[in-house]
Amino acid sequence: MASRDPSERSPLLGGRSEPPVPAGSVFSGRGLACAAVLLSELLERVAFYGITSNLVLFLNGQIFGWEGTQASQALLLFMGITYLVSPFAGWLADALLGRFYVILGSMVLYLLGMLLFPMVSYSGTRTAFCGDIQWAQIENCSRSNASSDDTCPEPSRRYCAPALFLGLIIVGLGVGSVKANITPFGADQVKDRGPEATRRFFNWFYWSINLGAIISLGGVAYVQQNVEFLIGYIIPAVCIGVSFLVFLCGKTVFVTKPADGSAFTDMVKILAYFCCSRKHTRENTRNIQNNQHRHKQSRLDMAKASHGGPFREDKVEDVKALVKIIPVFLALIPYWTVYFQMQTTYVLQSLHLRIPQIFNNNHTLPAAWLTMFDAVLILILIPLKDKLVDPFLKKRGLLPSPLKRIAVGMFFVMCSVLAAGILESERLEIVKRDKIQQQIGNVTYYAANLTVWWQLPQYILIGISEIFASIAGLEFAYSAAPKSMQSVIMGLFFFFSGIGSFVGSGLLALVSIPQIGWMSNHSDLGNINGCTLNYYFFLLAAVQAATLLLFLIISVKYERQQSKTYRRL
């Protein structure tokens, strides 16, 4: 039976056959297309971080009055949705619409969801979406002059939850669809220039992501916390609108390809055949053994037409490549669980540390600015990595593989959450004897008299982990993908990231139940002074440490398999 070109199944990076391209010419003739992709992604990230950077503060404020754990869970659920939708968006692009039109349509959906947040921020339209707030008497409200007659929103009820979750879901669907397709779409612009061009594109793609994060965290988050959330949500809505226009105008210079069928559908059929045909395993395995030469074949080979199955050789080989990659993605779940703490529990911790005033006595340092240090570090280090470190290591044959870089990233993210746990232990001791009140976003927080700058180590460590794990993860997902499964495998990479976010939300809910009680404190909305958040951080560090050991085993096994494959080519 005829099959496709073998290059359709070979990895896109790291192959032996592609001629080297001079470093100065890798983007020649494709600069405008790459610039349009990078600018669109930059603006999209401004919009994304405009939602996520202060969502905990927004929901925990006076208007909505959600508890700190409830606000953190909402953000973790939102992050999970944005990543879980990625494989399905990849399938839609491959099977029906093509990447360009899926990205374009996703940005429209993104914009519709973004428009809901200014509407619920504005008092004139909030009631139409949320109804009237229900008030109930509780004790110990977050006010310095609280009395038994004071009323606050009932902590068990989340005001405006249906409208807010609807907006988060719509935005999440848009974000996830863009995320799954814009990365491989951007790489498509330079993939014919060789692996060096693709590697450098991913470096600059990630650089653009973090520049967008800095713009959003530095400007939008400041406006939200110190000026008004209404203006702070209009800005990201405008940014996603401009991103849509930039991407639309780039159609004339983009390298695009039409939908040519989804390998995701073939993958499901082949795996279903394999699982439902186990009764034929012995006979097919015997046939495989008779046809073996020098290397061991997979049991999935029984699905091939040459072994009595109904599927083409190349399609089965694609699925075999996917099966080898899945364990790596599974091992990354705890990494993402820790990574997403940066915008949730890390922010809760910062709200209960002493935050300095800036510019005037009415403006305070935005809690989200700590996240900006992570992005600034990446902006500085990625160009150094791209221009100096990587070429230096490559000339000497010392450039680590993507899997080795991911392992290093896991180590640094473990150190980050461990540092957060140590800081939280110290904060809980200090707040007992030296408590201060501070006004943040029109809400009074009771904080330890310990400067928020002590959080810098955990943010720096998580930034270093991104340079190793996140960039290498994107590169691995793209390089390990046969050409027919680029969007599928890239989507699965983000899918497992979403699972990591849901795991974090689930763990937070678990440690909040009264039987455990680490985060069970309903007496003060958003207050973590009566909680043991440090235990949660130490739990995450322990899980990541165990997973790092498992990942090292998986990565060594995978690289050995790849080495054998290259020797056979």
Curated annotation (Swiss-Prot):
Tell me where the transmembrane regions lie: 46-66, 73-93, 100-120, 160-180, 201-221, 229-249, 322-342, 364-384, 406-426, 460-480, 488-508, 536-556
Catalytic activity entry: glycylglycylglycine(out) + n H(+)(out) = glycylglycylglycine(in) + n H(+)(in); N-acetyl-D-muramoyl-L-alanyl-D-isoglutamine(out) + n H(+)(out) = N-acetyl-D-muramoyl-L-alanyl-D-isoglutamine(in) + n H(+)(in); L-alanyl-gamma-D-glutamyl-meso-2,6-diaminopimelate(out) + n H(+)(out) = L-alanyl-gamma-D-glutamyl-meso-2,6-diaminopimelate(in) + n H(+)(in); carnosine(out) + n H(+)(out) = carnosine(in) + n H(+)(in)
Molecular function terms, GO-annotated: dipeptide transmembrane transporter activity; L-histidine transmembrane transporter activity; peptide:proton symporter activity; peptidoglycan transmembrane transporter activity
- SUPFAM superfamilies xrefs: MFS general substrate transporter
Gene3D superfamilies per the UniProt record, alphabetical: MFS general substrate transporter like domains (1.20.1250.20)
Q: Which GO terms describe its cellular component?
A: early endosome membrane; endolysosome membrane; lysosomal membrane; membrane
- BP GO terms, sorted: dipeptide import across plasma membrane; innate immune response; mast cell homeostasis; peptidoglycan transport; positive regulation of innate immune response; positive regulation of nucleotide-binding oligomerization domain containing 1 signaling pathway; positive regulation of nucleotide-binding oligomerization domain containing 2 signaling pathway; positive regulation of toll-like receptor 7 signaling pathway
Keyword field: Endosome, Immunity, Innate immunity, Lysosome, Membrane, Peptide transport, Phosphoprotein, Protein transport, Symport, Transmembrane, Transmembrane helix, Transport
The record, for CDD domains, names: MFS_SLC15A3_4
Q: Which family does it belong to?
A: Belongs to the major facilitator superfamily. Proton-dependent oligopeptide transporter (POT/PTR) (TC 2.A.17) family.
Q: Which PANTHER family match?
A: OLIGOPEPTIDE TRANSPORTER-RELATED (PTHR11654)
For this entry, the protein name equals: Solute carrier family 15 member 4
Q: In which organism is this protein found?
A: Xenopus laevis
Encoding gene (name): slc15a4
